[in-house]
Amino acid sequence: KGEDIDIVVGLRESGQLCVNLAMVRGGRHLGDRPLFPVNAGESTVAEAIAAFIRQHYAAHPAPARLIASPLPEEEEGSELGALLAELAGRQVPVVEARSVLHRAWAEMALQNARLAILARNQASAQQEQRLQALQQALELPDTIQRIECFDISHTQGEAAVASCVVYHGNGMKKADYRRFNMRDITPGDDYA
């Protein structure tokens, strides 16, 4: 079949909540997009799915049908249906997977959410190990909380710029990145 369907599944496992969006267009699976809501707190998986649907389809076109697992609560589901109809200009049914093909897509999306959680947890563990190795190499007595790295660059000795990247907690903190134009300095002479 040449269906246009999005499959939205949620999974809470190993201390992570993942909402995975699988997109099917013209009957072809185009891929998955796992998302990890930052403000989910103690939300249920169904609440996280409902919040994702609200936010995602406010900015992206809705397909002909939306499969959700688990389905949002009944009251929440009717509000979502009305919102999607308003945004799309047509009815967009939010249903559970019933046909064999739809169940297979939903199961694949759930498995991909599980793999995304596993990959995220492994990356976090590796990052923790690297941070401990750095702490030992620098002989720091306390756990590293924040690292700021600066790089000074220039173009043929002119237009010197300092760039700062920041690591905080468990990852890079791009909101704290900075660039500084440097004035009134002796130009560099390393033309390598």
Located regions from the model:
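Conserved catalytic/ligand-binding micro-motifs in nucleotide and anionic cofactor chemistry
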Residues: 1-192
